[in-house]
Each structure stands twice: as C-alpha cells, then as structure tokens.
Amino acid sequence: MEEERGSALAAESALEKNVAELTVMDVYDIASLVGHEFERVIDQHGCEAIARLMPKVVRVLEILEVLVSRHHVAPELDELRLELDRLRLERMDRIEKERKHQKELELVEDVWRGEAQDLLSQIAQLQEENKQLMTNLSHKDVNFSEEEFQKHEGMSERERQVMKKLKEVVDKQRDEIRAKDRELGLKNEDVEALQQQQTRLMKINHDLRHRVTVVEAQGKALIEQKVELEADLQTKEQEMGSLRAELGKLRERLQGEHSQNGEEEPETEPVGEESISDAEKVAMDLKDPNRPRFTLQELRDVLHERNELKSKVFLLQEELAYYKSEEMEEENRIPQPPPIAHPRTSPQPESGIKRLFSFFSRDKKRLANTQRNVHIQESFGQWANTHRDDGYTEQGQEALQHL
C-alpha cells in the first residue's frame, strides 16, 4: 500500500511539472496512474467500457515517451553540430586566405622575374657597349686628351651606380620572398593544427554519442525492470488476496457444517482445517500449472543479468563500429566530415507502457479464473456434506489438489 501511495504521489507530481522538465520516469509514473484508473473503471463497469480506449491511450503514452527521450538528447547534439559547423567555416576561410596569399606571392614573383630580366638585359647591353668601346679604344691612338679621359671616367661611374642600384633591388626582392615563404610556412602550420583540432573534436563527438546511447539503453533497461517488478508485485498481491478469500470461504463453510453435527465433530475440526491447509499446500505445490517455481529475488537476479548482457552486447557493437570507422579513415588518409548517422530501421520492441497495461488485463483474467474456482469449491462443499468422516479420505484430498 505504501508503494502504491508513493507511485500515485509521484505520478501526480509528474502531472504538475512543466512540460520541458518531464523525464522518462515521469512518463512511466503517469502511465501507472492511468493504469490504476483503468483498473478501477474495469472493476466498476467491466472490460468492455474501455476496450477501444486503452490502445489509444497506450499509443499516446508511447509517443510522449519518445518525445521526452529525444528532448533530453537533442541539446547536446545541437551544440556539437554548431561547433562542428563553426570549425568548418573557419577552415574554409583560412583555405581561402591561403589561396589569395599564394596568388599574391605568384604575382610578386612574376614581377620580380620581369624586373630581373630587364636588368639582366640592360647589363648585357652595357657590357656589349663596354666591349665595343674597349675595341675602339685599342684601335685608336693612346694619346687621349684630358677631356676625353674625364668623359670616359664619368661613363664608368654612371655604370657603377646603375649596377649598385640593381643589386640593391635584387637583394630587397630576395628578402621579401624569404619573408613571404616564412609567413606561408606559419600559415600551413596553423592549418595543420586546426585540422588536428577538428579530428579531435570529431572523436569527442563520436564518444559522446556513444555514451549517450549507452546511458539511454541502461536507463530503458532499468525502467523496464522496474515496471516488470511492479507488475509482478501487483499480480502476487492479487493472487494472495484471492487465495485468502477462498480459504476464508472454505473455513466458514466447514465451520457451519461441523456446528450442525454436534459435539463430536467440533473436536475434530482443527484437524480438518490443518488437513485442508496441508492439502491446499500440496495442491498448490503439485497441481497448479502457474505455481511459483522461483523466488522474487531469483527473478530480479535473472533480469539484472539479462540487462547487463544486453548493455555489454550494445557496447561491443558500438566499439566495433567505431574501430571500423577508424580503419576507413586511415585508408582514406583525408580528414573528411563524418557522415550523418541515420537510425537503422529495426522492429520496435514492446515498450514498458504496453507491458504495464498487459499486466492489468492479465489481472482481470485471473479474477475471472478465481470466480470459476469459487464455483468449483461450492460443488466440492456439496460433495463433502454427503461424504463426512473423521478425517479426509483420499478422494477428498484429490479434489483439494484439483482445486
């Protein structure tokens, strides 16, 4: 009773929560509260009153469960996607800047080559003129006037200044080219660092997705286990109540029969009750096809072991997919953005909400079976009135086992 009150309070608090704060546990609490209300309606009006309504309510609760689970996972994925898009845009901008810089360097190099070619042609022309002058000078007389000597000296000085200017221009352009090369190397290092950062963020994103899927699988397994245990507990309590009611009716009937027989039969009445209880225990242990063959703790252990195995299998599958993706990346050797993983279409397993409502319908079937057993017990009471004895005969024990 305390557990039922606690679950009812949890469901009411879940109904009062804000829509953005709902969790999967709140959805299951709401489903439990709706199931209890359905059970009350079935007890009062029968199963036909909600036969068409129950599947629709179950479907609505399943849709709510899926939406709540997506709402909790979506913000983290959106942040990671925005970060990845931002890094891609930065990378594209840097690549574009690098291309522009390369084009500028090519233009500067072309200009420098053109100027150097012009200067070389001028030097060749001056050297040719110098040779011609030297040959002319050798053929003429050695007697030069002072004016001619000064003129020749002025021409050589002008050529020397031109050569000096050309050398300065060439050195300056060489320094500029070296500076541009250093700047280009730094830009390439920045691009490589950004690519490494992008690959690291992609791996972190993949690990986070893997962890989110594992946590979702574990949460769903725990929720399903809780629902199954609650349903088993409810069925056990209802079975205990029905068995107690049957035992009370049998005892009242036997006490009424023995009170009519006088003083001798009340002395044997406790023995009869003990034999009834023993016979009922034997019948429950041997003839009941639905008798418990294991304890509740064993059932919990089996469910826990099954959930652990499921989570391990899921982890191994994710690791295998991760290693396969790494091998593909190593084969390609080109950092590419990861493809958007589409969820694989697989048959949807039965949700905990359907399982919960199936337990409620199963309880109604058990109540119908208990009513049938009460009818059989009344027929057995008539048979016992006709075959009274000091103790139960073998036929009476067989009838109890049948019950």
From Swiss-Prot:
Keywords: Cell projection, Cilium, Coiled coil, Cytoplasm, Cytoskeleton, Phosphoprotein, Protein transport, S-nitrosylation, Transport
Residue ranges of coiled coil: 76-258
Post-translational modification, as annotated: S-nitrosylation is required for the interaction with GAPDH.
Comp. bias regions, Acidic residues: 262-275
Domain spans labelled RH1: 10-97
Any one Gene Ontology cellular component term annotated for this protein: nucleoplasm
Name of the protein: RILP-like protein 1
Designated gene of the protein: RILPL1
